[in-house]
From Swiss-Prot:
A GO molecular function held by the record: triose-phosphate isomerase activity
Protein name: Triosephosphate isomerase
CDD domains: TIM
Function: Involved in the gluconeogenesis. Catalyzes stereospecifically the conversion of dihydroxyacetone phosphate (DHAP) to D-glyceraldehyde-3-phosphate (G3P).
Chain's gene name: tpiA
GO cellular component entries: cytosol
EC code: 5.3.1.1
SUBUNIT field: Homodimer.
Amino acid sequence: MSGSTIIPWVVGNWKMNPKQSDAIQLVQQFKDLLKQQPISEQYCHVGVAPIAIALTTIQSELATANRQVATVAQDVSRFAGTGAYTGEISAELLTDSQIRYVLIGHSERRDLLGDHVEILKAKLSHALNAGMTVIYCVGESLEQREQGLAEQIVLQQICDIAPVVSAEQWQHQIVIAYEPIWAIGTGRTASPEDAQAIHAKIREGLCQITPAGSQIALLYGGSVKPENAVELAACPDINGALVGGASLNAESFYKIAQAFAQTQQ
């Protein structure tokens, strides 16, 4: 079958897991699977987002894989450059360490760590201007969904960042991850039909914001597992996955990446 012109992304968000020794073992297991049955980069981009103190270690481990696997930062500072910002890591410091991908806007950071829209815009602006590719997360709560506000909330979250993203950055440096908050870490997931429906609305909204809207990868991030990956991958506006718990198991993560790669073959 002929695949979409958008190459899928499958990114493992490890969150505050695991210990560094276990992380190295996890990467080695994943590399072994790729060696046994490679997943071509022309069919699927793959990345992992480890804890900050393991970024360069994991990057070094991945450098010996038989294909490029991106190392993704889980967050970036709202402050640029260097300076007296205790505990912060700027986009410039990440790129200086050859980390060129970053998650911004994850619901856990919004809800637990106070990342409101102005902070997110600052993080996004600095990351984009430093040349990073940003996986920008949007999503609604269960209460918002039950009130029929899911589409409105998600589209507003995208419109909020539009002023700090240039036309060229939309085209080359933005990936959108839709993560229904009510499905994260709960084992619940939207049906493929529901996920496709809101992804289609996101696509429609992006096309109103930027001419690049039809070519921006849209990832689904609500409890993606090998058991539902094939159905999700078959949806025309789901161009990959932001994977949480399942990415902590090398075989599960590999199967999810394989499911999306097969849509391009």
